[in-house]
């Protein structure tokens, strides 16, 4: 039974009377949360130094706050550190690739990071799609088509798992 500190908490089941509809968070709320999280991380780092587990969280905060240079810096640090972020391993690579694209960085450097992501996560369709988009931009249509076919194959494979 749930209790308040000083009294019993009454719970009611009202399935036909109440409907809760969560619409997500507005951009301003998300940015506020990211700024708050970044501040907490920075305070933690000031107290005990930067640890490898901070890197992915810093990368994520900076990406959401649209500081793409810092996103790249912390994504690269996280990758180099070898930190394991359970359930989010590919997120660091996604943030890195997206940040590089947003900053219109050199396409060959971008392709290098995309290829690294593909080597690390060959089962994921996302990075093949990223590669196809860069190749299309470079007018390398045959190579882009191969990668787009890989995307479709990977999605089909996921559906049959």
Q: Which residue ranges define each predicted feature?
A:
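Catalytic-site signature of metal-activated, phosphate-bearing donor transferases
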Residues: 1-73
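TPR-repeat structural position
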Residues: 34, 68, 106-108, 141
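Tetratricopeptide repeat
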Residues: 35-38, 42-45, 72, 79, ...
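Short coil turns that delineate tetratricopeptide repeat
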Residues: 49, 83, 87, 122-123, ...
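Start-of-helix register in tetratricopeptide repeats
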Residues: 53, 87-91, 126
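Structural register within alpha-helical repeat arrays
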Residues: 58, 96-98, 131
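Residue at a conserved register position within TPR or TPR-like alpha-solenoid repeats
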Residues: 62, 100-102, 135
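Structural motif corresponding to the intra-repeat A-B loop/turn of tetratricopeptide repeats
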Residues: 65, 103-105, 138
């Amino acid at each position: 039974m749930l209790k308040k500190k000083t009294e019993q908490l009454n719970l009611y089941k009202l399935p036909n009377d109440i409907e809760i509809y969560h619409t997500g968070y507005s951009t301003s709320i998300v940015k506020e949360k990211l700024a708050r999280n970044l501040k907490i991380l920075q305070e933690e780092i000031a107290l005990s130094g930067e640890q490898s587990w901070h890197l992915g969280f810093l990368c994520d905060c900076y990406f959401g706050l649209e500081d793409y240079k810092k996103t790249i810096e912390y994504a690269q640090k996280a990758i180099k550190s070898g930190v394991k972020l359970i359930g989010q391993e590919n997120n660091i690579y996604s943030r890195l690739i997206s940040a590089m694209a947003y900053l219109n960085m050199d396409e060959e450097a971008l392709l290098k990071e995309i290829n690294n992501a593909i080597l690390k996560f060959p089962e994921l369709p996302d990075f093949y799609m990223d590669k196809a988009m860069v190749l299309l931009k470079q007018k390398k249509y045959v190579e882009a088509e191969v990668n787009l076919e890989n995307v479709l194959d990977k999605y089909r494979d996921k559906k049959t798992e």
